Amino acid sequence: MTQKHLKLNNLNQHLHDGMSIMFGGFMGIGTPAKLVQQILDSGVKDLTLIGNDTAFIDTGVGPLIVNNRVKRLITSHIGTNPETGKKMIAGEIDVELVPQGTLAERIRAGGAGLGGILTPTGVGTVVEEGKQKIQIDGREYLLELPLKADIAIIHAQKGDMNGNLAYELSARNFNPLVALAAKTVIAQVDNLLEVGQLPPDEVITPAALIDYIVCSE
C-alpha cells in the first residue's frame, strides 16, 4: 500500500470538534457513506458541513444531522431531510442556504485562491441581505465570498494507488469540486487499481489533490 492508503479507523486522527467538512454527492449519491459513518462513530461534534444538500435521514450526511453533530450548514437544499428543517427552526443548526450554482462557484473560488465571485443571482431577494453589491456596466452583482474547509470527503467509483480518481455518472456531482478547496482531501474508493491500470483520459481528479484513500470494501 502507498502512504496515501488510510485505514478507516485512522480517519479519527484527522477529525476534531468544531471543524469544517466539505462533502461531495447529490442527494446522497456520490457521498462517501463509510467516511460519514466513521465521522459519526468518532464522536466529533459542532461541525460545519458544506455541500449541495443534506440528502435523507439515513442517507448521505443525514446521520450527522439526525445525531446532532452539526452546528452550521452551508448548502443548497434541505427539503428531503425533515430533520434539517426541524433543527433549523428550533435554532439547533445555523443554516445558510445558497443557490446551487453560487455554492459551486464559491467552492471553486476557494480552491483557486480567489477573493470571491460576482453573480447576479439573488439580487433583489433575501439572498442579498448583508452582502456587498457591485455595479458593472449598469448591472448589479453580489460579491459572494469563497468557501474552504479543513477536510473534504469524496467518493470515487475507481482510483489508483496514487490517488487518481474516476467517477460514475451523477455520482461525480460536487466531488471533483470540493477536492479543490480543503486542506486535507480523503477519498473513499470502490475499486482500487494499481498505478497504470486507470487510463489517463478517464481521470477526473488527479492524484495531486488527494491526501488519503480509503477502500470501500
Curated annotation (Swiss-Prot):
Binding site for CoA: 24-30
Documented EC number(s): 2.8.3.8
Protein's pathway: Lipid metabolism; short-chain fatty acid metabolism
UniProt KW Transferase keyword: yes
One Pfam family matching this protein: CoA_trans
InterPro entries: 3-oxoacid_CoA-transf_A, CoA_trans_fam_I, CoA_transf_BS, NagB/RpiA_transferase-like
Reaction it catalyzes: an acyl-CoA + acetate = a carboxylate + acetyl-CoA; acetoacetate + acetyl-CoA = acetoacetyl-CoA + acetate
Coiled coil location: none
Entries under PROSITE patterns matching the protein: COA_TRANSF_1
Gene Ontology annotations of biological process type: short-chain fatty acid metabolic process
Keywords noted in UniProt: Fatty acid metabolism, Lipid metabolism, Transferase
A GO MF label: CoA-transferase activity
Stated role: Coenzyme A transferase which is involved in short-chain fatty acid degradation and catalyzes the activation of short-chain fatty acids to their respective CoA thiolesters.
Xref: NCBIfam families: pcaI_scoA_fam (TIGR02429), PRK09920.1 (NF007394)
Protein family per UniProt: Belongs to the 3-oxoacid CoA-transferase subunit A family.
Subunit structure, as described in the record: Heterotetramer composed of two alpha subunits (AtoD) and two beta subunits (AtoA).
Name assigned to this protein: Acetate CoA-transferase subunit alpha
Gene (UniProt): atoD
